[in-house]
């Protein structure tokens, strides 16, 4: 095996199938690029990202693990978020939750 190589069965791979999602329009109002990783609690992202923040509570980007989305200054884009799963406890990030999601 080559480092980073993936061997998978043929066919379609479904990520986060059947999980609750929300779609938001997000704009970078700052003067620096902002990159958000796949498992970052989107509600707690940089304040320069303008969007309906309360709708992102308990959600992360609906993208493959280990990837990210970059928002250039002045850029707006539509993103799909997926509900966090497991224990639904959030610690760290920007420190806005620090416990169980409500």
UniProtKB/Swiss-Prot annotation:
Give the domain of life.
Bacteria
The catalysed reaction is:
urea + 2 H2O + H(+) = hydrogencarbonate + 2 NH4(+)
* Subcellular location field: Cytoplasm
One GO BP on record is: urea catabolic process
What GO terms fall under cellular component here? urease complex
What pathway, per the record? Nitrogen metabolism; urea degradation; CO(2) and NH(3) from urea (urease route): step 1/1
| UniProt keyword annotations, A-Z | Cytoplasm, Hydrolase
Write one Gene Ontology MF term: urease activity
EC top class named in words: hydrolase
Q: Which InterPro entries match?
A: Urease_beta-like (IPR002019), Urease_betasu_sf (IPR036461), Urease_subunit (IPR050069)
Q: Give the family per the record.
A: Belongs to the urease beta subunit family.
Which named protein is this? Urease subunit beta
Gene (UniProt): ureB
């Amino acid at each position: 095996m080559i480092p980073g190589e993936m061997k998978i069965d043929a066919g379609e791979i479904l990520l986060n199938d059947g999980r609750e999602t929300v779609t938001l329009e997000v704009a970078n109002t700052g003067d620096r690029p902002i990159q958000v990783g796949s498992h970052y609690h989107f509600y707690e992202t940089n304040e320069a990202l303008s969007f309906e923040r309360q709708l992102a509570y308990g959600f992360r980007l609906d993208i493959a693990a280990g990837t990210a989305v970059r928002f250039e200054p002045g850029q707006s884009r539509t993103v799909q978020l997926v509900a966090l799963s497991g224990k639904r406890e959030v610690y760290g990030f920007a420190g806005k939750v620090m416990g169980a999601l409500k």
